[in-house]
Structure formats: structure tokens, C-alpha cells
């Protein structure tokens, strides 16, 4: 009886010590990550915002997560999601074709410019917006759902009170410091991206389609993805604008692990500053190290 009690006590004590000792590296690691992000930001000369959600345990790493950042083309995820949501009640919607005119062309239209005087389906426009960041495609999607205010209204339906889309392409990319137009916070975008890609914000087939399009993105190799192990699967949407604004938002599938949601926003004080995708890659490496 005494031996059994002693054994139970020993096991409990060992477990307690393990938990106590284990908690020290956890807190230390959190502080270490914050310090590394702060140092990355200092060296970059800009302002960095990061939000990571580990869906395995709902733990988060947050850095300037409630500050506003210009979304630039990361807002295309919300516009496409709004169209997908609409398609739930209109089954043939994605096959609907939209006319492309020369007057529609703006500063970046790698896919749409090939269809001038022709048409593209809403599915094709969605893929072009997400996978090639085509700005004509984005504008057509925004127009289809009723304008920027309607995209914002869709975000509100999802419970996102921070996202706001005020303009179309390319003016939504001005990213003027302190300008609230076309902005969100890393925390808000991370939660919304989780709801859209892993949650119940969209129907099963619509969610699967969004994820498929994001996995097929062609613009993100030097951003978040560059800071991750090669075996991890990434679906992302990049964005860039004035003031060297450089963004990427991603849903990530580590090998044999639960998915991660990662939002990285970066902007600089100089209007003509160069994009810094390397900063996003470094941030991704810092927050996922050890996972």
C-alpha cells in the first residue's frame, strides 16, 4: 500500500516537474519570438504586423496584430470569397461570363489583357485574381457583388469588424500612412482567413474551391513560403503597394501537423520604397521555428 502510494506520488511529482520545466521554455520561446520580430522590424526600417494561429491548439503569435495595415491585393481573398458565398444560392454563378474591354485595363492585368473584346467566367476571374493578382479580375469581382462596400458588408457577415474595402484597383494600393481606407489588422485577417479556408464561413465545395485556388498561387514563392520547410504545403495571397508595402496571407499545412494560419503585413515610411518579400520570409521562419 505504501509502495503504491509512493509510486503514485513519484509519478505525480515527475509530471508536475515536467510541466513546470516545460513551461519555462514556452514562455522563453514566446519572448524570444517577440524579440526576434522586433529586431527584424528594426533592421528593416519599416512597420511589421504578424498573426499566426496554430489550429492544433489555437495558440497564437501576435506582433502589432491590432494595428491597421493596407491590405493591397490580399483583399482579393475577401472579394473572391464574397462571390463564392453568392454562388451557394446561385449554383451556375461561377460559369457566368463577363465582358472584358480595353478600357477595363489598369496597371496589372496579366490574364485579363489576353481576353480583351472577349469574356471571362467568374470562376476564371477568381482564379486570375488569386493566382496572378490580376487587377482587372479583382475589379470585375468587386463590381459583380455590388462594389467595395458590399465586400466590406460580406466581411461583417463573417464577424470581421475590422476589414474595410473602400476603393478598387489600383487606387486601393496607395497605402498612405495613417489612412484607414482599404485596411485591416493582422489579427482580424488571420481569424477571417481561418473561417474562410478551414471553418464554416463557406459551404464545403466553395471552401474547397477557395483553398484550391490559393494553393495554385504563382506570386508567393519569395514571401511566406520562402521561410518555411519545402515539405509544407502553402496556399497564399500576396499584396504590394506604395510605401514599399509588402504583404502575404497564408493557410499552411505542415507535414503531419494541423494547419497554420499566417498573416504578414509590412510597410515603410518612404513612398517609393522597394518591396521587401525577404522580411515576410524571415518573419515566417521566426514564428514557425520549432513547430
Curated annotation (Swiss-Prot):
Domain of life: Bacteria
Spans through the membrane: none
Main location: secreted
Single GO MF annotation: beta-lactamase activity
GO biological process, one term: beta-lactam antibiotic catabolic process
InterPro entries in alphabetical order: Beta-lactam/transpept-like, Beta-lactam_cat, Beta-lactam_class-A, Beta-lactam_class-A_AS
Record-listed a beta-lactam binding positions: 76, 133, 169, 240
Active site: 73, 169
Keyword Secreted: yes
GO CC term (a single one): extracellular region
UniProt xrefs under Pfam families: Beta-lactamase2
Activity-regulation annotation: Inhibited by the beta-lactamase-blocking agent clavulanic acid; in the TG1 strain.
The keyword Secreted is assigned to this record: yes
Record annotation: effect of changing residue 250 to S: Significantly reduces catalytic efficiency with respect to cefotaxime
Oligomeric and partner information: Monomer.
Function: Extended-spectrum beta-lactamase (ESBL) which confers resistance to penicillins, as well as first, second and third-generation cephalosporins. Has cefotaxime-hydrolyzing activity. Inactive against the cephamycin antibiotic, cefoxitin, or against the carbapenem, imipenem.
Listed name of the protein: Beta-lactamase CTX-M-1
Organism: Escherichia coli
Lineage, highest ranks first: Bacteria, Pseudomonadati, Pseudomonadota, Gammaproteobacteria, Enterobacterales
Amino acid at each position: 500500500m505504501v509502495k503504491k502510494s509512493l509510486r503514485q506520488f513519484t509519478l505525480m511529482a515527475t509530471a508536475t516537474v515536467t510541466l513546470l520545466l516545460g513551461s519555462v521554455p514556452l514562455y522563453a520561446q514566446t519572448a524570444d519570438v517577440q524579440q526576434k520580430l522586433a529586431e527584424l522590424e528594426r533592421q528593416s526600417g519599416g512597420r511589421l504586423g504578424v498573426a499566426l494561429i496554430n489550429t492544433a491548439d489555437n495558440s497564437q503569435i501576435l506582433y502589432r496584430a491590432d494595428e491597421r495595415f493596407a491590405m493591397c491585393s490580399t483583399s482579393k481573398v475577401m472579394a473572391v470569397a464574397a462571390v463564392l458565398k453568392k454562388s451557394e444560392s446561385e449554383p451556375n454563378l461561377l460559369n457566368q461570363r463577363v465582358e472584358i474591354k480595353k478600357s477595363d485595363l489598369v496597371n496589372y492585368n496579366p490574364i485579363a489583357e489576353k481576353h480583351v473584346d472577349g469574356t471571362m467566367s467568374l470562376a476564371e476571374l477568381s482564379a486570375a485574381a488569386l493566382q496572378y493578382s490580376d487587377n482587372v479580375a479583382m475589379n470585375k469581382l468587386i463590381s459583380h457583388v455590388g462594389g467595395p462596400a458590399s465586400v466590406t458588408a460580406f466581411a461583417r457577415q463573417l464577424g470581421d469588424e475590422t476589414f474595410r474595402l473602400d476603393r478598387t484597383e489600383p487606387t486601393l494600393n496607395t497605402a498612405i500612412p495613417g489612412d484607414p481606407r482599404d485596411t485591416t489588422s493582422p489579427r482580424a485577417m488571420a481569424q477571417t482567413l481561418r473561417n474562410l479556408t478551414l471553418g464554416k464561413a463557406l459551404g464545403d465545395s466553395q471552401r474547397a474551391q477557395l483553398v484550391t485556388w490559393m494553393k495554385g498561387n504563382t506570386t508567393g514563392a519569395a514571401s511566406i513560403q520562402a521561410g518555411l520547410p519545402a515539405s509544407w504545403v502553402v496556399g497564399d495571397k500576396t499584396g504590394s503597394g506604395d510605401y514599399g508595402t509588402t504583404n502575404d496571407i497564408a493557410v499552411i499545412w505542415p507535414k503531419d501537423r494541423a494547419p497554420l494560419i499566417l498573416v504578414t503585413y509590412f510597410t515603410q515610411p518612404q513612398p517609393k520604397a522597394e518591396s521587401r518579400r525577404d522580411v515576410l520570409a524571415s518573419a515566417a521562419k521566426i514564428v514557425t521555428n520549432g513547430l
